[in-house]
Amino acid sequence: MSWQCSKVQEHPKNFTYIVECSDGTLYTGWTNNLEHRVETHNVGKGAKYTKSRRPVKLVYFETYSSKEEATRREWEIKQLSRTEKWKLIKAK
């Protein structure tokens, strides 16, 4: 059992993601469970920003091995302009 736990900790998946809200705006976040996080946004239990802009649609994500990498990338993406974010989305 402890072997499995340590193995999981060696290769965790963390995601930086962008969702498009129903009003056309973009929201960037990070999570360790991408499918669940998008569902959470869509039932109104996610970020305050997305609660009144449902439904949201996943348009972009990147995978990282650590929370620190994912949150660093989240910050970097949040610094981009809307146009730059769309370029990133379309390039993938």
Model regions: which residues?
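GIY-YIG nuclease catalytic motif and its immediate N-terminal context
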Residues: 1-46, 51-55, 61-63, 68-78, ...
